[in-house]
Amino acid sequence: FHIALSVIEMRSNDGVIPEPLSSEQLPDKAIMLADAALTAALAVAVRQVYGDNPVDCRLAVIAMGKCGAKELNYISDVDVVFVAEPAESKATRVASEFIKVGCRAFFDVDAALRPEGKRGALVRTLESHVTYYRRWAHTWEFQALLKHRPMTGCLPLGEAYSAALSPMVWEASKRDSFVSDVQAMRRRVLETVPDHLKHRELKLGVGGLRDVEFAVQLLQLVHGRSDESLRQLATVDALAALIGAGYVGRTDGASLIECYEFLRLLEHRLQLQKVKRTHTLPEDSDTQTLRWLAHASGFSGEKHRSSIDLMEETLRKVRLNISSLHSKLFYRPLLDSVVNMSVDELKLSPDAAKEQLRALGYNYPDRAFEHLTALAAGASRKAKIQAM
């Protein structure tokens, strides 16, 4: 595993070998390795619990987060959820051993995204999962399910889990407090970043990776009810789908993708340098590490400006751009995302369209619907195309 991971790391670093991996190839290679490694971990766990005895349960491992979305970094934790039939003591022991083996040999395996978090049962039946999400799940838990995929174990059971829960994900925007819940979750994430780290935080801070991800996920959850093309796992794929369907303007969308991929590049390079999971830039005084990061990320010094200066200037622009676009898409009533699409194009009845406007944060959806219908009817085809 570690040899294979080292090969992926070397092949993703321009200048190390003649044929480096592209940014599109890297996640595919990493996820193939992760799935294979964790399938092996599950086989070891089953052997430890059952020995030579027949296996009397079905256990599916559901990948969540970056692993579920096939967006793994070089050094990532792997979020998982377990579903078993029956969910008895041996299934729980297998899941527990799977986590131990995975953590010792491969990745930090984390099952905290399961129903009720760390206080909840490690393993549940499919029926128990469905009951939980129908009755007690919070909005953020449906948001987390955007990234789920059956990874290993009993894949038919994993597919049944997906078939049962996916419809609930795409109905989540009907919840009365949906928009405010998602926005509050983003604010809580920001509050976890210490003041002295805010300017160095690539992932959680203002203008960071999470700003892009939250904006994209909000749009997916709102518009994905009626548009299945938006039901993508990876952030960049989802953003491309939002652009293609007209929910995000082409210029804004292309800019977000470029900025997001730049931050991901810095994150990848940081992990290569430190050989650990991190998304925090070096301290300003650590010029040696900053210089390495700048060079590894493709920056070369100029006559009057160092590679560090150029990297930091680019990073400032990226953060400002992400922050501006995040506010436009995430905190304002999303008129810009809806106005280009008529009710017929959205394939919604008037009542369903008003319901969607309510989910978007409009206090008077009936009035907003009237304005949008008038705008859509009055806009020429040429004007719509030019606005995209």
What kind of region is each of these model predictions?
Residues F1-M388:
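A nucleotide- and high-energy phosphate-metabolite-utilizing enzyme signature
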